């Protein structure tokens, strides 16, 4: 389970004339999600729920109903605006906030000395074994 942390409030919500996809009544009894990021200037961005909003200069705080919406907005902030400091929190009805992305403080696309390597095979693709030579040996091609 991720560490429980206080949210960096003091920011404001982006300027948006529509809705955020409805926090649904379930959010009051289950959970909702929060994405927090810093912007150097006001910029227009696409909301994951449809429409466009203007992020404020400084800290932006936006509640959304689904985790996927927060991840979609995070990807947009990274690719379009080069904003890499966004954090996603799960907010429970009792007010408890849990950081869910990035869990260890480093986004998953970055290298981290403490992070375990998954799915790494130390060879070039041309050095892969011929699948016919591995067939019926009981081993997988990535284990050879």
Swiss-Prot record:
Keywords: Cell inner membrane, Cell membrane, Membrane, Photosynthesis, Photosystem I. It is found in: Cell inner membrane. The keyword Cell membrane applies. GO terms for biological process: photosynthesis. InterPro entries: PsaD, PsaD_sf. Pfam families: PsaD (PF02531). It is a peripheral membrane protein. Its main location: membrane. PsaD can form complexes with ferredoxin and ferredoxin-oxidoreductase in photosystem I (PS I) reaction center. Belongs to the PsaD family. The G.violaceus PSI reaction center is composed of one copy each of PsaA,B,C,D,E,F,L,M and Z, and forms trimeric complexes. This is Photosystem I reaction center subunit II. It comes from Gloeobacter violaceus (strain ATCC 29082 / PCC 7421). The gene is psaD.
């Amino acid at each position: 389970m991720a560490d429980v942390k206080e949210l960096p409030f003091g920011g404001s919500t982006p300027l948006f004339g529509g809705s955020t996809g409805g926090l649904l009544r379930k959010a009051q009894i289950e959970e909702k999600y929060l994405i927090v990021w810093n912007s150097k200037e006001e910029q227009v961005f696409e909301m994951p729920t449809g429409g466009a909003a203007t992020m404020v200069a400084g800290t932006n705080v936006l509640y959304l109903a689904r985790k996927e919406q927060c991840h979609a907005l995070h990807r947009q902030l990274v690719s379009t605006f080069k904003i890499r400091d966004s954090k996603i929190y799960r907010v429970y009805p009792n007010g408890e906030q849990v950081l869910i992305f990035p869990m260890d403080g480093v986004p998953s696309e970055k290298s981290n000395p403490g992070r375990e390597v998954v799915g790494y095979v130390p060879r070039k693709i041309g050095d892969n074994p011929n699948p016919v030579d591995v067939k019926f040996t009981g081993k997988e091609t990535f284990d050879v």
